[in-house]
Amino acid sequence: MNPNKALLEKGDFTRIAKSMRESGEALVQRLGITKGLKVLDLGCGDGTTALPAAKLGADVLGVDIPRNLVEAGNKRAREHALANCTFQEGDLSDLHQLPDQAFELVVTVFGAMFAPKPFEVAKEMVRVTRRGGRIVMGNWIPNDPTLVAQILKISSTYTPPPPGRLRQSDDVGDREQRNRAICWRRSSSRKNILHARHVYIQLPRRTVSARK
C-alpha cells in the first residue's frame, strides 16, 4: 500500500487544504483555461485547483489516493453545481485506468511532490498528456519561506528519503540531472519537450510543455 494513503486517511487534511485555496486560484488564472479544456489534477485533495479550473469551463478530473479527500472533492463539486468536475481514487504512479494522451493540461499543486515513486509519476504524467499539451507542477522549494516548506526542509534532515526521491537539501545540479532524465524517458529525442522553466507567483511552480 502507498504509505501516503494510510497517513492522509487518518486526519482531516481538508483543514490544511482550505489554507491553500488562494494558491490554487492564482495558478489557475495563469493557465489560460478555456471552456471544454480536458484537465487532469493529480494529488487533487478536495479540489483546491480542480474547482477553480472547472468554474472556468474546463472538464476536470481530480485523482488522489485518500478516499476521504476524494469524497470531499466530489461533495464540493456538487455544492458548486459543477457537473464538469469529478474526483476518483488513484495512485499517481499507476494511472492505468486513464488512456494515453487523454488530457490537454495535467496539473499537480503540492501533490505529486509527495509521491513515493516520483519517476513513475513523471512517466504517467507524460503518458496521459496530449501532444502539444502542458504539464504544470506547483512545489515548495528549499528556500521557500512558507511555514510548510520550512517544516518539510527540517524534517527531511532527520528522515531518509524513499528510493528515487530527492531531499530538499540536495544539490541543484542533481535535481537538474533528474529533470533531464524525466524528459528523456518520454522519447529518445528531446524534440517532444517544448520548454521547461520555473515561474514564480505567490508560490513557485514548474511547467513542462510537450509537443509533437
Regions found by a protein language model. Give the residues of each.
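A short glycine-rich, Lys/Arg-flanked "PGG" loop and its adjoining helix->strand segment in the class I
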Residues: 119-134
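A short SAM/SAH-binding and catalytic strip from SAM-dependent methyltransferases
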Residues: 104-119, 141
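Class I SAM-dependent methyltransferase SAM/SAH-binding core
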Residues: 38-96, 120
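Conserved Class I S-adenosyl-L-methionine
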Residues: 172-212
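Acceptor-substrate binding/catalytic loop of class I
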Residues: 143, 162-177
